[in-house]
Amino acid sequence: MAFRFAGLLVSITCLLMSHANASGEAQKRWERMNQIRQEKFDLVLPEVMRENDVDMWITVNREGFDDPLTEDFGKGYVGSYGYYVFTDRGEGRIERASLGVGPALVEDNGAYDIIGNADDLNAFVEERDPQAIALNYARNIGAADGLCYTSFQKLSEELGAKYAERYVSAEKLASDFRSRRVASEIAAFAWAGEMSRNIAERAFSNEVITPGRTTLAD
C-alpha cells in the first residue's frame, strides 16, 4: 500500500512539474509576442503608414471571424464587432485603439493607448477626421484581405458616406508591416530555429531510431 501511495505521489509530482513547465513556456511565449508587438507598433507602424500615405488603419473583427492580422494585433474576444484602429496624429508614434475587443488580453499586452466600445467608432473617427482610411481588402495578398463584405457594409453604415469615399486598400501597408522585422522578432526566429534543430536531431538519432528495426509507421 505504501509503495502504491509513493508511486501515485511521484506520478502526481511529475504531472504538476510538467504542467508548471508548460505554463512557464506559455508565459514566456506570451511575453515574447507582446515585446515583438510593442516594438513593431513603435518602430515599424509609423514608418509604413507614412510611406503608404495612410492616416488611419482600421481592422474589423466579428464574432467567429477573425482577421488574419488579429494575432499580430493582440487577439481578444469580440462579441459582435470589434475594431483595431491605428491613427497617425502627426506625432512620433501612432495612436493605437481597441474598440469592442474583450479587454483582458488587450490590457495585458500593454500595446494600446485607448480601449473602448465598438459603439464609439463613429465619434472616434469623426474626432480625428482622417483623409485616407486603410481597410484590409486586397487583390493579391490573402493575409491582407480579411475584411468580409458584411463587415465592410457594417463599417460603411457606422462611418457614413463621407468616410466611405476615403477608403483605400491596406494590401501594401499590411505586407510592409508584417515583412519588416524588429530585433525581438529576429531573436524569436533564431530561438524557433534552434528548437526545430533540436527536435530534428533527436528524431533522427539512435535514441529514437533503431537501425534495421524502426519503420516509417513508427
Predicted segment positions?
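Short, intrinsically disordered, charge-balanced linker/junction segments flanking boundaries
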Residues: 212-218
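N-terminal secretory signal peptides that target proteins for export/translocation
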Residues: 1-3
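Charged- and aromatic-enriched interaction segments used to assemble
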Residues: 166, 211-212
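A composition/biophysics-driven feature that prefers long, compositionally simple stretches
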Residues: 21-206
